[in-house]
From Swiss-Prot:
Pfam families: EF-hand_7. GO terms for cellular component: myosin II complex. It comes from Macrocystis pyrifera (Giant kelp). Belongs to the calmodulin family. Keywords: Acetylation, Calcium, Metal-binding, Methylation, Repeat. This is Calmodulin. The modification N6,N6,N6-trimethyllysine is found at K116. Ca(2+) 2 binds at D57, D59, N61, T63, E68. The modification N-acetylalanine is found at A2. The keyword Repeat applies.
Amino acid sequence: MADQLTEEQIAEFKEAFSLFDKDGDGTITTKELGTVMRSLGQNPTEAELQDMINEVDADGNGTIDFPEFLTMMARKMKDTDSEEEIIEAFKVFDKDGNGFISAAELRHIMTNLGEKLTDEEVDEMIREADIDGDGQINYEEFVKMMMAK
């Protein structure tokens, strides 16, 4: 399954994996998974976190290593995000609920995820997704960006 991913996707997932793997030991624990989920506005129970890990923990050692993470991501990409999930994600980014994601909101979320981005990088992300050129991302643009992965 993971062999259907492009090199670019694998590189992106490696980056995401390192965001989760806070102590850099090459595995994601329930604690690390919980930290990231909470920074995204989710509030999973310990049992839910354990279930998420068990789902992809091929060798049964209680943590997720990178190959297991890749398999999970490949699976997730196959059953592409439901519209509901995309709406939820949009709401997480759209802090003030005005229907747009501003550069400030994007920067805030990325910083929460542990991504220290320069203003240029944030502006570049906005520019890439900002089809109508108004300097912010509306829902349609967000959906296109999410589906383009």
